[in-house]
Amino acid sequence: MSPLRPLFVSGALLSLSALLLGLSGCSSGSSTGPIGLPSYTLTAAALNPGSVTAGNASTSTIMVIPANGYTGSVSLSCSMISGGTPAPSCSFSTSPVMITGATPGTSTLTVSTSSSTPGGNYTITVAGSDAKNLAPSNGAQTLSLTTAAVIQHIVVIFQENRTPDNLFQDPVLIKNGADIAQSGVNSLHQTITLSPIDLGTAGANPQNYDLSHAHSAFVSMYDGGKMDGADLIPCSPAANCPPNAHANPQFMYVNPSDVQPYFALAEQYTFGDRMFQTNEGPSFPAHQFILSGTSAPTATSDLFASENMSGGSIAGCIATAGTTVELISPSGVESSSQYPCFEHVTLTDLLDAKGVSWRYYAPSAGSIWTAPDAIEHICQQITVNGTLTCNGPDWANNVIIPQSQVLVDIANSQLAQVSWVIPDGAESDHAESNNGSGPSWVSAIVNEIGNSPYWANTAIIITWDDWGGWYDHVPPKVINDGVSWGSGYVYGFRVPLIVVSPYAKSAYISHTTHDFGSILKFIETTFSLPSLGYADVAADDLSDCFNLTHTPITFQKIPAALDAAHFINDKSPAIDPDDE
């Protein structure tokens, strides 16, 4: 049996060699004509239209022309003899076709693609068989058809440090079935009601502290799957819990008035309440997973980066000497550390090999959020005036600083086929360091795409890189299939997921288990890429979030306090992420 093939296609030439050959078969009715002489020929008009979007069809007129006075019927059949799976299907309006003396007969060939037909070159054999099982006398005909993808652009927006319980206390989502809790249990087995807090650092109830989201904080909160240790998570060392911190600082939810743009997106499109970060800790490994499906130092290592940097504030291959990152085994033991410069295949390599354009938008180089700077063959670091600097061609051409350039590129019709968009600290939603503009930032990107021609063929994936130390009630699942990456390893905690597209399911709650590997697998299937062989192997491909055959959703602007012009014109210095 052929292996399953992608659910989406990229623009590709679908060659349909309609080989009008004779195959054994039968026809009905009587026939007349000279014995031993050719009885008919076949012709095929060019497929019309010559280009279709996957899920549509094209037609050709097949003409059966009698020869040597033949009168009788000719049966037509077609079969796909090469190409991808599922292949296009074909059918005839009339078969058998009757021909009489000098009068030809016709039939319409319809070649139908489905939304899941992969790009590739296909050969269709169209066979004719008369009453004596004779083939047409003139041999093969060749037709060609160009297909365009349903999804041609994917934008991954990667925000910071939230859980569904913390960020999405939305009555509409809850009414629609989203699994959101209003209370939780602490290590003393007490029920703690979640309390409101502002998203940013300004306002009447500011979020002026951060919580640890190190691997040790994960272990405390997870508590072997009981999810009752959130109260044991300390405030981040960078903040040290100010005196006015709440009695239960981990058991908080963001004021709904601060995140209405997020609610609007989640209510209109698809919201995932079983999206988990792949790693059990903070941002540096999370950003490696969203780029590569792994945070391992090498392709053969069974250890994975588990923490942010120690010994220096600059990350990746341009980190200062003495900077290290902790490594963890699949069993959850942090036992060693190394310099944070890695070498293995990333999704960008698969995109480059297939000729699929990509860009990674980030606020700065050397950040724990700028994943490509930790991949040696992308960074290709050199020393300039005593400072390490990334200098590789992929870095120079595809890593774009600052992150607001994505808004300019959309407006100028220069959006790559795959984009990662990383926020500045101010717009990141990260506790203590954000100014509350994250919902406007995300909405600005969505609105720019929604009001452009890109809307018709774009999928926007919005998620958050880790849980940030906030309480969430859903325990992560164990990756335990025994064969793929991470077998026996537990996912990190839930993070929100919003899928925005004209082909996203409307007002849909996805209860399917997703993780960062799902985003990679979605990109792989969309562009017919091979598997990275890491977290993508065990992941789903987000297919339950889409309906590629429904009427595309008409975009409606997402109301927000700030628009694209604000972020394009904002020249404030970048706010660095936390380093805990």
Description of each model-found segment:
Residues 21-25:
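C-terminal motif of bacterial Sec signal peptides marking the signal peptidase cleavage site
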Residues 1-13:
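Bacterial N-terminal signal peptides that target proteins for export
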Residues 26-148:
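Long beta-sheet-rich domains in secretory-pathway and surface-associated proteins
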Residues 148-580:
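N-terminal pro-sequences and low-complexity stem/linker regions of secreted or lumenal proteins
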Residues 14-18:
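Core hydrophobic alpha-helical transmembrane segments of single-pass membrane proteins
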